[in-house]
Amino acid sequence: MLFRSNYAPSDWCYNSLFADDNTLSRKGDVRLKATFTSQDANRVIKYPNGTYQLAETSDYTCTPVVISRISEMYLIKAEALGKTNGAAALVEYMKKRYTTAPSEAAIKALSDKEYQTLILDERRREFYAEGMRWQDIKRTNRLELLETLDGRTYLMYYPIPQDEIDMAGTVAYPQNPGYAGYTGN
C-alpha cells in the first residue's frame, strides 16, 4: 500500500538525521547518496519511483503518510524473529543494501539490546524523512535513543484531534497531557 503527500521533515528531525560519521562510514550504502548531501542542508521529499525534490519550505504537515515496501518487511521479519532466528533475515536484507554485510554469526553474537539497536539504526536510515522513527522508539520503549525530551514527557504522546474528542459525544474524552487547548489546526 502506498499513500504519498508532498511533505518535509521538521527542523529537529532533519538535523537529527543528517549524515554523520556512522552513516558516512557504511561502505556500499546506496541510501547515503540518494538521501543525504554533504554540501548543503536541503530537505528531501522522496517519491515511490525513487526520484526526489527539494522541499520549498521547512514547514511540515500533519498529513499521514503510509508506506509499506519490501525493505520494511525484511526488517519487521528480522525484528519479530529475534536475534536467534532473525539473523538470517537481517543478513539477507543487508546483502541487498550493502556491498558487505555482517555475517549471521556476528549478528548472533550481539546482545538482544545490540540486535534491536542494529535493526532500529537500519530502520532510521531506510525510512529517512518518512516519519517512522518516533513510532519505532515508542514501540520498542527505547527513549534513550532520543537526544533529549528536556523534561517534556508529554512529547511521548500525540495530541488527540479535537474532531475525535467531539465525535465521542457524551463520553468524557480527555486530551493527552501537555496539549490543553490543542485543536489540531
Regions found by a protein language model. Give the residues of each.
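Acidic/polar-rich alpha-helix caps and helix-coil junctions
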Residues: 1-4, 8, 19-185
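Basic, alpha-helical nucleic-acid-contacting "clamp/cap" segments
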Residues: 16
